[in-house]
Amino acid sequence: MATIKQNIPHAHTRILGIGAYRPSEIVTNDDVCQWIESSDEWIVKRTGIHTRHRAPEDVSVLDMAEHAAREALENSGLTGEQLSTIIVSTVSFPYLTPSLAANLADRLGATPAAAYDISAACAGYCYGVAQADSLVRSGDSTNVLVIGVEKLSDVIDNHERSISFLLGDGAGAVVIGPSEVPGIGPSVWGSDGSKWDAIRMTHPLTDIRTVERGGQRTFAKDLVDPETGEMDPDATLWPTLRQDGQTVFRWASWEGARVAQEALDAAGLAPEDLAAFVPHQANMRIIDQMAKVLKLPESVIIARDIAEAGNTSAASIPLATHRLLAEHPELSGKPSLQIGFGAGLVYGAQVVLLP
């Protein structure tokens, strides 16, 4: 009987290089307060956010991903042709299919690399790192591009105040490849679907396709005024994000810290072994609470990119890491604990050596 041949695995992996893209338009808290009843003082006190970036209409999710990817490739000393796999985490790509990753592979000259998108919201980048680590160690891939990218300005209602004022646009990317030493620890990831509605869209896409009339669902295309050619305004209601802030805050502050501790334990490290802590940039108070529960010493540098970038969902951890390395280049090669958590609720964490 013939024996199935398997790929030769790689013992270890690490992040080879990182890239980022931040849109040029900056939205201040005073700008936000034109849309909601609030103040700069209240927003800073409750969230730690001063500004967030917004992409213009002519800059797409794909464009932002490409910018971040090209920098990550350059910093890795690689070209698109050397990529085996591309993993993109996003909840704001406007096409259900085909994937952003496949389009990006073509732009980067990475064809025929495997390419796919994942939807794990603010934990998506850590999910991508977990998958890339496994793909490289199994021998199924050699170099994997992982991207977190969001144009959340496309999926928010500026006039609601549960989540929209928190969110920003941007992209972060890393290349993961083989390493002679362990550079990515075991991933701790999972979900709690009992809190599925804690962060959600207002309604499904099918509600755009049809609207209710006389107790029945009617196709939106049939609700066009024959004289004016205009569509019924109810037929074009675009889904936007909403959040139960208290539920998310409580879960992230305590359960999130537990997950982060599990990742630290799985890597065989203690808090004092860390050089940096890069949590999802959801809220400055959550970041501070998690650091307190984890009992991180003052020597651990904590990423606080949220102050300037807001919450960028899947992009937040790579963006925060990118800024951290720019401000503290001495952290390169040192261990960092990263954790993402968000809509689902889903979570993912691991310890990595910074590129």
From Swiss-Prot:
Domain of life: Bacteria
Active site (record annotation): 122, 280, 311
Compartments it resides in: Cytoplasm
EC number per UniProt: 2.3.1.180
Enzyme class: transferase
Keyword match Transcription: no
One Pfam family this sequence matches: ACP_syn_III
Region (ACP-binding): 281-285
Annotated keywords: Acyltransferase, Cytoplasm, Fatty acid biosynthesis, Fatty acid metabolism, Lipid biosynthesis, Lipid metabolism, Multifunctional enzyme, Transferase
Main location: cytoplasm
GO process annotations (BP): fatty acid biosynthetic process; secondary metabolite biosynthetic process
GO CC annotation, single: cytoplasm
Gene3D superfamilies: 3.40.47.10
Function (record text): Catalyzes the condensation reaction of fatty acid synthesis by the addition to an acyl acceptor of two carbons from malonyl-ACP. Catalyzes the first condensation reaction which initiates fatty acid synthesis and may therefore play a role in governing the total rate of fatty acid production. Possesses both acetoacetyl-ACP synthase and acetyl transacylase activities. Its substrate specificity determines the biosynthesis of branched-chain and/or straight-chain of fatty acids.
Domain writeup: The last Arg residue of the ACP-binding site is essential for the weak association between ACP/AcpP and FabH.
Family note: Belongs to the thiolase-like superfamily. FabH family.
Protein name: Beta-ketoacyl-[acyl-carrier-protein] synthase III
Native source species: Kocuria rhizophila (strain ATCC 9341 / DSM 348 / NBRC 103217 / DC2201)
